[in-house]
């Protein structure tokens, strides 16, 4: 049942919208739930509408209206089946609503956060179950007002009629502009996204709790695979086991495609075919992380199938990557430039590969400046984690002096993500970042390296002896705290990991 767009005025508005209330189907559950911090409840009452207010502060605006659309229901092309639903993260950040076809407004001056839910549709309710009602939404989400979608255009018009001179409508994308707006309405499409990116870079207590829970479930799933890996014969079984554990513990969604790469497949950074035999493979690199209430975890473990290192080659590369991670994590604290940790990881990799004979003919400084270490460590040390597995954050063009750029440029590439970039600000308390060093022996990368100026630093005969390994990566999610750091990742690694595989833990 939809409102007739021909009616006008507040009286007509009430007539059209209020009857929708009579169709509510309300489900009452006996369990309590945390309300998402659109505004905080006790004991955080001093931080009401924390996220919305924080974004307004980053905007530097005392008035204006923020409008955000959630993910609409969309069918697959040439099909009557809908696409798997995934909520838009900017919308979720201000609302906590993980339901399709919703939208919100935040009136900065009035400090009013309003949620708009789908109009009741009897046919849809019969076939798919009821959509979110106003009462359920008001109970579940900590917003000031809940309205049906039919009232949105009237609410927007009311704001337009009363808005102050200079007040703007803030949008992320021009394509999300609400219908029925005057063509001459001043839209601000430039400031909202940077403001929200900056706000999202530092997590509050609720967000940290969600990321910690996502890591807890991921840790259980990784542990279950270690316990049963000796009975598995194909990468697909690893993927299936991980999904089964996550779903059975309440985490239906993965933060990203599972990477279950055995042997040489582990040299492909985002390998996700997950369909090859494990037979005679020295290692499995499992990069998999569950999502909890839209918040991601990002966890990688690399392990031998028997719980014993099959050769010195395999053990030496694992131990080198383990050292890279341990030394970088130990230095995380607020005020640290993350890029310096990336630099340290490359220095440790270069030192280790020199000792193993993969590198030759140069000092650590010479090899770093040549860029040769990117052949075997081609990605950034880490990135932010939050509502996205590669989460957003502030970008400050003043973060690094031009004179310091030369020492970092050779070991950076276009795939490096904040905070592992020249423009990233220093680490702050509340940031969650990954530390994920890796060493890979990709035949393609090594073939290309033969034609580069830094080829003289590589002993290709020695490097070829490691190709069967594929690659080793170890990745944890690290919270920056007031006094240092907390490792949120609970998946076993190192000697504990090996003992679990052997059944001796």
Swiss-Prot record:
It holds the Pfam family Peptidase_M24. Keywords: Aminopeptidase, Hydrolase, Manganese, Metal-binding, Metalloprotease, Protease. It catalyses: Release of any N-terminal amino acid, including proline, that is linked to proline, even from a dipeptide or tripeptide. Transmembrane segments: none annotated. The keyword DNA damage does not apply. Binds 2 manganese ions per subunit. One of its GO terms (biological process) is proteolysis. Its cofactor is Mn(2+). Mn(2+) 1 binds at residues 298, 436, 475. GO terms for molecular function: manganese ion binding; metalloaminopeptidase activity. Catalyzes the removal of a penultimate prolyl residue from the N-termini of peptides. This is Probable Xaa-Pro aminopeptidase Pc16g13390. It comes from Penicillium rubens (strain ATCC 28089 / DSM 1075 / NRRL 1951 / Wisconsin 54-1255) (Penicillium chrysogenum).
């Amino acid at each position: 049942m939809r409102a007739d767009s021909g009616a006008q005025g507040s009286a007509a508005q009430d007539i059209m919208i209020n009857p929708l209330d009579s169709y509510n189907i309300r489900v009452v559950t006996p369990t309590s739930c945390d309300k998402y911090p659109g505004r905080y409840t006790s004991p955080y009452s001093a931080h009401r509408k924390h996220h919305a207010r924080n974004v307004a502060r980053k905007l530097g605006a005392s008035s204006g209206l923020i409008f955000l659309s959630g993910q609409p229901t969309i069918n697959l092309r040439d099909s009557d089946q809908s696409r798997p639903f995934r909520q838009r993260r900017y919308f979720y950040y201000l609302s906590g609503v993980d339901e399709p076809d919703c939208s919100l407004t935040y009136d900065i001056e009035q400090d009013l956060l309003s949620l708009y839910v789908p109009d009741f549709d009897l046919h849809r309710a019969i076939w798919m179950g009821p959509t979110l009602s106003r009462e359920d939404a008001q109970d579940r989400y900590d917003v000031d007002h809940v309205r049906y979608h039919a009232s949105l255009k009237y609410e927007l018009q009311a704001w337009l009629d009363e808005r102050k001179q200079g007040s703007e409508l803030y949008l992320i994308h021009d394509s999300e502009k609400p219908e029925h707006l005057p063509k001459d309405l001043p839209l601000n499409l430039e400031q909202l996204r940077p403001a929200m990116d900056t706000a999202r870079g530092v997590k509050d207590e609720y967000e940290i709790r969600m990321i910690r829970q996502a890591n807890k479930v991921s840790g259980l799933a990784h542990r279950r695979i270690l316990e049963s890996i000796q009975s598995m014969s194909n990468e697909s079984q690893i993927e299936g086991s991980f999904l089964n554990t996550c779903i059975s513990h309440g985490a239906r969604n993965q933060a990203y495609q599972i990477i279950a790469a055995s042997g040489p497949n582990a040299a492909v950074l985002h390998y996700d075919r997950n369909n090859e035999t494990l037979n005679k493979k020295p290692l499995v690199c499992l990069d998999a992380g569950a999502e909890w209430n839209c918040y991601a975890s990002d966890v990688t473990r690399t392990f031998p199938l028997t719980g014993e290192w099959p050769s010195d080659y395999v053990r030496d590369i694992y131990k080198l990557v383990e050292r890279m991670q341990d030394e970088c994590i130990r230095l995380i604290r607020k005020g640290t430039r993350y890029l310096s940790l990336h630099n340290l990881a490359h220095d440790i990799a270069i030192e280790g590969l020199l000792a193993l004979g993969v590198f030759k003919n140069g000092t650590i400084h010479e090899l770093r400046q040549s860029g040769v270490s990117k052949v075997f460590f081609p990605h950034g040390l880490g990135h932010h984690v939050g509502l996205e597995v590669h989460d957003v954050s502030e970008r400050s063009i003043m973060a690094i002096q031009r004179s310091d750029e030369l020492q970092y440029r050779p070991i950076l590439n276009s795939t490096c993500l904040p905070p592992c970039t020249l423009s990233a600000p220093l680490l702050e308390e509340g940031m969650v970042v990954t530390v994920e060093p890796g060493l890979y022996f990709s035949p393609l990368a090594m073939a290309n390296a033969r034609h580069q100026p830094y080829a003289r630093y590589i002993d290709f005969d020695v490097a070829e002896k490691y190709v069967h390994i594929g690659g080793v990566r170890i990745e944890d999610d690290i919270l920056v705290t007031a006094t240092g750091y907390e490792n949120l990742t609970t998946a076993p690694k190192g000697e504990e990991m090996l003992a679990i595989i052997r059944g001796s833990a």
